[in-house]
């Protein structure tokens, strides 16, 4: 089979397609390699929710769990060994893509319980980088207030970073500043900037879910349903274009520094009244990443409506959407604060589920 034509058109428009899922079954069965060859997938993202699901219902981990139990590994250590092995093997599958260009990246998240602890986030990120030991790893760090300085410090050590849980353009600007500061420090530390990569994971569908819910109690709110998330992402892209055209970045680019690409995350559609490819179709733009759950990937392969760049030059109309939301009484600052808090809480809960699953598996294996 040749690469799907819809997904090829998406790639040609400058969108790198990453899969927002990973499991040992997907690796061992050859499915991941098949998605690379047939569905234009050039990277993978994982998160605690994905790993909790993978480990809870697959026999593929049994042998390693038995080995871990036999040597008395702690639950925390077992979780790390199980997840880093999957990430390492996925990184090897993507190695050729990585060596050919700027994709082939595989992302692994720091323990989400550290989201508000700068020092421990830095330590964990550096430990993960050493444990996986693959140049195409990206360590995921949340864009919390405490995460921002951690992002800079980890980049300064030459480590590639996927910044996650970004909801507002204001916080995204902080993230880009943290990235540039990290590159500046990495250069001062003697690192090759060309070897450092970063993406900024801007969450999409959750914004519509939260704002649409609030619009239900607003007179005339139906007019604004389903507009916020795409407008938000388009405003973020305008900020990206501005920052990476700046003299500050140009000085880093002259030393091999790369732009921190926007990555559209949370692109699975939650509302069944919307097209299941809307967060793909409407967010096509050069030098972006769209990380898709498998259902969104297959839907896009089947019926994505790829019409070229749908993002550039749309900041003014997107700002009008936000002005209308504010005029309707939607407290956008509160929306983004709630989404960040819920995002961290969701990943913490998944992490606890992951720990509990592995704890039970270790006990059964003894």
Curated annotation (Swiss-Prot):
<dbReference type="InterPro" id="IPR018225">
    <property type="entry name" value="Transaldolase_AS"/>
</dbReference>
<dbReference type="InterPro" id="IPR013785">
    <property type="entry name" value="Aldolase_TIM"/>
</dbReference>
<dbReference type="Pfam" id="PF00923">
    <property type="entry name" value="TAL_FSA"/>
</dbReference>
<dbReference type="GO" id="GO:0005737">
    <property type="term" value="C:cytoplasm"/>
</dbReference>
<feature type="active site" description="Schiff-base intermediate with substrate">
    <location>
        <position position="140"/>
    </location>
</feature>
<dbReference type="GO" id="GO:0005975">
    <property type="term" value="P:carbohydrate metabolic process"/>
</dbReference>
<dbReference type="GO" id="GO:0004801">
    <property type="term" value="F:transaldolase activity"/>
</dbReference>
<keyword id="KW-0570">Pentose shunt</keyword>
<protein>
    <recommendedName>
        <fullName>Transaldolase</fullName>
        <ecNumber>2.2.1.2</ecNumber>
    </recommendedName>
</protein>
<dbReference type="InterPro" id="IPR001585">
    <property type="entry name" value="TAL/FSA"/>
</dbReference>
<keyword id="KW-0704">Schiff base</keyword>
<comment type="pathway">
    <text>Carbohydrate degradation; pentose phosphate pathway; D-glyceraldehyde 3-phosphate and beta-D-fructose 6-phosphate from D-ribose 5-phosphate and D-xylulose 5-phosphate (non-oxidative stage): step 2/3.</text>
</comment>
<dbReference type="GO" id="GO:0006098">
    <property type="term" value="P:pentose-phosphate shunt"/>
</dbReference>
<keyword id="KW-0808">Transferase</keyword>
<dbReference type="InterPro" id="IPR004732">
    <property type="entry name" value="Transaldolase_2"/>
</dbReference>
<keyword id="KW-0963">Cytoplasm</keyword>
<comment type="similarity">
    <text>Belongs to the transaldolase family. Type 2 subfamily.</text>
</comment>
<comment type="function">
    <text>Transaldolase is important for the balance of metabolites in the pentose-phosphate pathway.</text>
</comment>
């Amino acid at each position: 089979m040749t690469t799907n034509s819809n997904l090829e058109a998406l790639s040609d428009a400058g969108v790198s397609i990453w899969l927002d899922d990973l499991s040992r079954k997907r690796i061992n069965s050859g499915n991941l390699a098949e998605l690379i060859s047939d569905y234009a997938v050039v990277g993978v993202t994982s998160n605690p929710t994905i790993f909790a699901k993978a480990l809870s219902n697959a026999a593929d981990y049994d042998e390693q769990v038995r080995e871990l139990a036999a040597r008395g590994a702690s639950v925390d250590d077992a979780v790390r060994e199980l997840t880093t092995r999957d990430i390492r093997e996925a990184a090897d599958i993507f190695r050729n893509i990585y060596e050919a260009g700027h994709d082939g990246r595989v992302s692994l998240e720091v323990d989400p319980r550290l989201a508000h602890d700068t020092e421990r986030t830095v330590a964990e990120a550096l430990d993960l980088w050493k444990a996986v030991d693959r140049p195409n790893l990206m360590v995921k760090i949340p864009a919390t207030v405490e995460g921002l300085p951690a992002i800079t410090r980890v980049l300064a050590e030459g480590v590639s970073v996927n910044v996650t849980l970004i909801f507002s353009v204001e916080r995204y600007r902080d993230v880009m500043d943290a990235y540039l500061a990290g590159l500046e420090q990495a250069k001062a530390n003697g690192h090759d900037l060309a070897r450092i990569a970063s993406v900024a994971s801007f969450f999409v569908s959750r914004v519509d879910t939260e704002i649409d819910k609030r619009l239900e109690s607003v007179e005339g709110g139906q007019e604004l349903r389903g507009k916020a998330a795409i407008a938000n992402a388009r405003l973020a892209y305008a900020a990206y274009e501005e920052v990476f055209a700046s003299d500050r970045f140009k000085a880093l680019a002259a030393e091999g520094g790369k732009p921190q690409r926007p990555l559209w995350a949370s692109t699975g559609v939650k509302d069944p009244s919307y097209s299941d490819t809307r967060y793909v179709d409407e967010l096509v733009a050069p030098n972006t990443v769209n990380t898709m759950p498998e259902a969104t990937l297959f839907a896009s392969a089947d019926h994505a409506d790829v019409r070229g760049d749908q993002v550039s030059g749309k900041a003014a109309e997107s700002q009008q959407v936000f002005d209308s939301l504010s005029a309707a009484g939607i407290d956008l600052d509160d929306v983004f604060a709630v989404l960040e808090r819920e995002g961290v809480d969701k990943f913490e809960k998944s992490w606890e589920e992951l720990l509990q699953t592995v704890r039970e598996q270790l006990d059964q294996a003894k």
